[in-house]
């Protein structure tokens, strides 16, 4: 499935939907069929941007002022099992889900019990006002030993929009890269404990070590790991940031040159 995002034919879908495709064809509900060009894709969010030669297309309205809340009505629109356009109804079960699926980079999923079956991936998740709130991406289903029901996930439209416009502008999503593994512990005094440093990463080059506690990033303190990741991700490569750490009781400011996140 896919979602028309602009009147001139930019479409969002999931990367896994079009991966390894020799040709991509888009069939609209009105029966019109278009050959689509792949503009770019993003591994971390599993999103891809397509373009068809069309004008005056209808798009789903969005409302940036309305926050997605647990208990909201959710409608998943897509093409499950190639049956044709279908709508399933549920509620928003949770927001801010992370570490879902096979990529640690995918964060902040919307969880819903609206059915997302094979073929729904890349389709629209809308609210009861008909506003686009997410892009349906994956579900946790049956395994050999158990059956999971109602565990379906969508990428929030705010993240999807950001990826869309970056791919339209640059052909890909350019993210900042720091190169550490981290956690927050009870005795880290609100800081973020470094549990691993990737060799030859910006953090390693700046002298950051395992056991250091990050207190501030560019003078911003009390950051969660997710907030720190987002700040780094949004930082342009070759930009210097000041990381304030605690090491063996000493507070140290370390300049770090952010690099571009490697594609792998």
Residue ranges and their predicted role:
Residues 1-190, 198-199, 225-229, 233-239, ...:
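Serine-dependent protease modules
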Residues 256:
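Disulfide-stabilized, aromatic/cysteine-rich ligand-recognition loop
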Residues 11-12, 203-225:
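Conserved PDZ fold ligand-binding element
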Residues 204-206, 253, 264:
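Extended hydrophobic-aromatic, low-complexity segments
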């Amino acid at each position: 499935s896919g979602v028309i995002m602009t009147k001139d034919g930019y479409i969002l879908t999931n990367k896994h939907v079009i991966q390894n495709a020799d040709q991509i064809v888009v069939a609209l509900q009105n029966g019109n069929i278009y050959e689509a060009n792949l503009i770019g894709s993003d591994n971390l969010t599993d999103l891809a941007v397509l373009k068809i030669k069309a004008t005056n297309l209808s798009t789903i309205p969005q409302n940036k002022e309305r926050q997605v809340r647990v208990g909201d009505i959710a409608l998943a629109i897509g093409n499950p099992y190639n049956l044709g356009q279908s709508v399933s109804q549920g509620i928003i079960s949770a927001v801010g889900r992370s570490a879902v699926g096979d990529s640690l980079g995918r964060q902040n999923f919307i969880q819903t019990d609206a059915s997302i079956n094979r073929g729904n991936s890349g389709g629209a998740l809308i609210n009861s006002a008909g506003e686009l709130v997410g892009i349906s991406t994956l579900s946790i289903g049956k395994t050999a030993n158990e059956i999971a029901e109602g565990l379906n996930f969508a990428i929030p439209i705010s993240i999807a929009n950001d990826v869309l416009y970056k791919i339209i502008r640059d052909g890909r999503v350019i993210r900042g890269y720091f190169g550490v593994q981290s956690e927050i512990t009870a005795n880290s005094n609100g800081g973020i404990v470094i549990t691993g440093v990737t060799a030859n990463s910006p953090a390693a080059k700046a002298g950051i070590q395992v056991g250091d506690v990050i207190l501030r990033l560019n003078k911003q303190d009390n950051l969660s790991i997710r907030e720190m990741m987002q700040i780094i991700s949004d930082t342009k490569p070759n930009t210097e940031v000041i990381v304030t750490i605690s090491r063996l009781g000493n507070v140290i400011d370390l300049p770090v040159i952010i690099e571009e996140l490697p594609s792998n």
